[in-house]
Structure formats: C-alpha cells, structure tokens
Amino acid sequence: MTQQMTLTAEISADLLGYRLDQALAQLFPDYSRSRIKVWIENDLVKVNGIIVNRARGKVFGGEQIEIQAEIEEEIRFEPQNIPLNIVHEDDDIIIINKPKNLVVHPGAGNPDGTVLNALLYYYPPIAEVPRAGIIHRLDKDTTGLMVVAKNIPAQTHLVTALQKRRITREYEAIASGIMTQGGKVDEPMARHPTKRTAMAVHPMGKPAITHYRIMERFRNYTRLRLRLETGRTHQIRVHMAHIAHPLLGDQLYGGRPRPPKGSSEAFLTVLRAFQRQALHATMLRLEHPINGELIECHAPLPADFVELIEALKTDYQRYKEDLYY
C-alpha cells in the first residue's frame, strides 16, 4: 500500500550545477536518492510546472519543485504508553518538550521506546502520516522542543517551511573554553569518513549555518544561545567542535569534562554526573501550517541543566573570591 503526498520546494542558489536527483536529495533528506530517482523516472516530478524525467539534468537555482510522491506504507510500529510533555496542541500540530534519554525514531539499537511510539499511542490517527508526522529530530540526549504534524497537509506545509528556513529554532548550550564573542559558523557538513555514527565539516557536504551569542562565562566554560539557519544532523555539536569549543559532556565530539584547577568536590560531582551533551532546544517559532497564525513556544531548562549552570556559577564565584582575598 502506498500513500500520496505532495512535496514542494525551491532549488536554492547553492545547488547550482547539481544534478536534479542530487539537488532533490539535499532538499528532501528524509528520502533516499534512489527513491527520488524513481519518482523522477515515473514522471512524478515537476520543475517550474513541467514534468522532468531526467535525473541527470542540471539545476541552476530558483526552480520551483513539485513532487507527487508515492510513499510506501512504513513498517507498523507499536504504539507505546510513553508520557509526552505537550507544550502546544491543536487540530493540526503537536509541539512537545522532549526529555533526555529518549530517541525520536526507531532505528538500529532502538526498535521501540521512542517519540514515534509515544505519538502512535497518544494520537492513533497519526499512523496515517509518514514518519508519524515527525518533521525534524533531536538527538537522544538533547532536550527541548519539537513540532509534529497530525495530518498530511500540515506535514507538507511544515516540511516546506523548514526547507525555506521559515521555522526558527533556538538552543541553549554550555561550550568548552572561554569564548570572547558570538558569531556564525558557516561550514558544510557530511557523514564522518571513518566514524559511522558521527558527522563532520566537509567541503563537499550540505550547507550548514549556526549562529551563536554569549550569554554567560564561567571558568573553562561558556553558556551560549544558538540559532539554527539549517538543520543538519548533529549540526550544533559539530560546528562548536569545529571552532574548538565542543559542548560540555559531548563525548562523540571531544567535549569530555575538563574541571578547572582547584575545583571543589561538590562541583566535580555535578560535572561528572552530567552524562550528555549540554544542549537544549529552548525556543521554537513558526507559522501555523493551516491558518498561518504565528506560534512561539519556550521550554525551560531541564533540572540537570539548571543544576549544572548553578554549579558553574558557584565555582566561578568561589574562584573570584579566592582571587580577591
């Protein structure tokens, strides 16, 4: 059984010279290039309103894409009664505040116990929406806000909005090192050449842009507010590591805890107990996919993140007092 779904997008200028199938794979990363190629060959892809069936044809940027996608029904995942922290819900979307240690979608090593399983239990009709309406993902140990579509029209609009960078996603993080100013990381990303589970900055990768500003400085660490312009896998984690400021606790990208000299035992206990990357999706702003209403949601920092910040503040204050006296 297949589902019909309309996908729309605009070819961005940075895809100039790409083959059509390559460009569409960049625009629709949830679908494999082989599947996209089948859509092209089956006359399901229109470029500027005209059916195009040559996957190897070049694009120039600015073309309007419409795909009448045929999507095979996914394996039926099991609904599971996993609590969801719902921040906003209406007839078309759900916005949740994801806790740590929760995978978004079933995969290798995580066949169930995910956000997707929880959504199937909470709202059974979402089983008819591809990927149970999941528009974007957060890593297992990243906390915070995610938007989910409850029906196919909402999903189609949200996917397009994400591609056109009309959804604003802001994060808080603790980065290693003392940073002196905010800035922007504009570095393309791809799969790491040797680490199967990691991503890396790569000149032939997909465009990736992260903006960041300093909120607070501590000894050896800096609290940041970040905004995604694109949304690649592990983007903030990779970009911060690339500029030599990996996120505290991010073992995959070099962020193992580095206690400052003379740290108290109480501070060391908190630091050692924080066994994940210090990253939280704190704000999500979007236009409602059906009625166009502006929706902005905020998620407070989780308890372990608050405890970490308080410990960093206490350590910094103790250090300043020791200097003074």
Swiss-Prot record:
Keywords: Cytoplasm, Isomerase, RNA-binding, rRNA processing. It is an enzyme of class 5 (isomerase). Residues 18-78 form the S4 RNA-binding domain. Its main location: cytoplasm. GO terms for cellular component: cytoplasm. The keyword rRNA processing applies. GO terms for molecular function: 23S rRNA pseudouridine(1911/1915/1917) synthase activity; RNA binding. The active site is at D139. Responsible for synthesis of pseudouridine from uracil at positions 1911, 1915 and 1917 in 23S ribosomal RNA. NCBIfam families: PRK11180.1, rluA_subfam. This is Ribosomal large subunit pseudouridine synthase D.
